[in-house]
């Protein structure tokens, strides 16, 4: 797979079928007899092999793809990948009939993950996270967003984000970090949400920003978490620090989180099961991506589905992600996630594939760099042993990845 710097001379992948996922092109942007040329980690040509300019010089490396399909490298745009321990015991309690409240009273829930993360050092966090990252990468994932949110004080949020950043030194992958300090109340807050929001906006975000540990700021807007007014204070501080925002919105109730996210020009609003028409319209106007998370819906047995038809009608772009986390979506397969999005929520194959490539890149503010097979983008590719792209969504528990290329290597 090459070194972590991802630099190389000219490489050409020929005799391939391409799903370019180019923006503004119908469907998957398919090129039947295609080729891709890369240099210095960037795509310099993607299109019909017959139309490829004469690029080859001495030392050019050519790969015969033997008719395989090439898509952009997959992107998981919403994960909580860095955590310690697991919550399998809560899973057993819930199967035995315990309610969410009973689990929380027994010391479970997000607070359980906070306790575990605080007890672990940075090296331990990296070591525990790498197998989860490897599982994603084994399915052709080349970019992963990783949130904090189990530290909930300055030192532990920084530890979590530093561990996430270190993943990119350990593996050939692009990592985007998001500070989700406004995730839950830590035990020491003793139920005082206002004081904790003061801490997030006044201390945690500035401290994280000073060390450039976060690419974005997120929050959890929900009755069991933070109110729209509290999230607005967090987002005002993020804006002052020059950081883009994202939001866990309308998952368990409609607090108009989607509209709140849109009012701040959020990159994405995520979950969205209870989003209404006004929220969808606001997102469309703001260009905020709807990130669909079927893993959590499945795992906690939700019954209210995100309003996919509303998003289509208003032209809201949809991304699809694992929401990989220890409590509500212990999922590290983006391929299975696509199948869930199609089966549970009715997304089309084209929507699913766009959702883990182009629209996932858009949800991270990276569409100018990755997410499609176009000249000038990072040479992040996934090469598949399949007859047609629909197989990537249709099959379950099957991985047809032939090769994964990150920055040309």
UniProtKB/Swiss-Prot annotation:
Subcellular location: Cytoplasm
Pfam families: Amidohydro_1
Residues holding N-formimidoyl-L-glutamate: 150, 325, 327
Top-level enzyme category: hydrolase
UniProt keyword terms in alphabetical order: Cytoplasm, Histidine metabolism, Hydrolase, Iron, Metal-binding, Zinc
Catalytic activity, as annotated: 4-imidazolone-5-propanoate + H2O = N-formimidoyl-L-glutamate
Coiled coil: none
SUPFAM superfamilies assigned to the protein according to its UniProt record, in alphabetical order: Composite domain of metallo-dependent hydrolases (SSF51338), Metallo-dependent hydrolases (SSF51556)
Functional summary from the UniProt entry: Catalyzes the hydrolytic cleavage of the carbon-nitrogen bond in imidazolone-5-propanoate to yield N-formimidoyl-L-glutamate. It is the third step in the universal histidine degradation pathway.
Protein name: Imidazolonepropionase
Gene that this polypeptide is encoded by: hutI
């Amino acid at each position: 797979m090459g070194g972590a710097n991802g630099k190389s001379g000219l490489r050409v992948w020929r005799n391939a079928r391409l799903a370019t996922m180019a923006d503004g092109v119908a469907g998957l942007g398919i090129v039947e007899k295609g080729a891709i040329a890369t240099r210095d980690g960037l795509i310099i040509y993607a299109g019909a092999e017959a139309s490829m300019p004469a690029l080859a010089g001495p030392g050019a490396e050519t790969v015969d793809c033997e008719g395989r399909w090439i898509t952009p490298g997959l992107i998981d745009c919403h994960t909580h990948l860095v955590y310690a321990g697991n919550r399998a015991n809560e899973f057993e309690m819930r199967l035995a009939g315990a309610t969410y409240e009973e689990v929380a009273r027994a010391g479970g829930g997000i607070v359980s993950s906070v306790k575990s993360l605080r007890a672990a050092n940075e090296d331990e966090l990296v070591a525990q996270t790498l197998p989860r990252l490897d599982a994603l990468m084994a399915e052709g994932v080349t970019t992963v967003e990783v949130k904090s949110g189990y530290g909930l004080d300055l030192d532990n949020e920084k530890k979590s984000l530093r561990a996430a950043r270190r993943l990119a030194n350990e593996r050939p992958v692009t990592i985007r970090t998001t500070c989700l300090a406004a995730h839950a109340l830590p035990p020491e807050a003793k139920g005082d949400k206002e004081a904790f929001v003061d801490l997030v906006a006044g201390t945690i975000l500035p401290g994280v920003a000073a060390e450039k540990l976060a690419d974005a700021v997120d929050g959890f807007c929900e009755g069991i978490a933070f109110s729209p007014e509290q999230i607005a204070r967090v987002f005002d501080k993020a804006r002052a620090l020059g950081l883009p925002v994202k939001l866990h919105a309308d998952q368990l109730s409609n607090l108009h989180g989607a509209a709140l996210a849109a009012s701040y020009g959020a990159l994405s609003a995520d979950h969205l099961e209870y989003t209404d028409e006004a929220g969808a319209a606001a997102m469309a106007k703001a260009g905020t991506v709807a990130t669909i998370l079927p893993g959590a819906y499945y795992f906690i047995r939700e019954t209210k589905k995100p309003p996919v038809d509303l998003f289509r009608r208003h032209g809201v772009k949809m991304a699809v992600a694992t929401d990989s986390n220890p409590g509500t979506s212990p999922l590290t397969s983006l391929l299975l996630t696509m199948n869930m999005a199609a089966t549970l929520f009715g997304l089309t194959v084209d929507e699913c594939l766009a959702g883990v490539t182009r629209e996932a890149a858009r949800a991270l503010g990276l569409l100018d760099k990755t997410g499609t097979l176009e000249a000038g983008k990072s040479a992040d590719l996934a090469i598949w042993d399949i007859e047609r792209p629909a197989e990537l969504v249709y099959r379950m528990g099957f991985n047809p990845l032939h090769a994964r290329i990150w920055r040309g290597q």
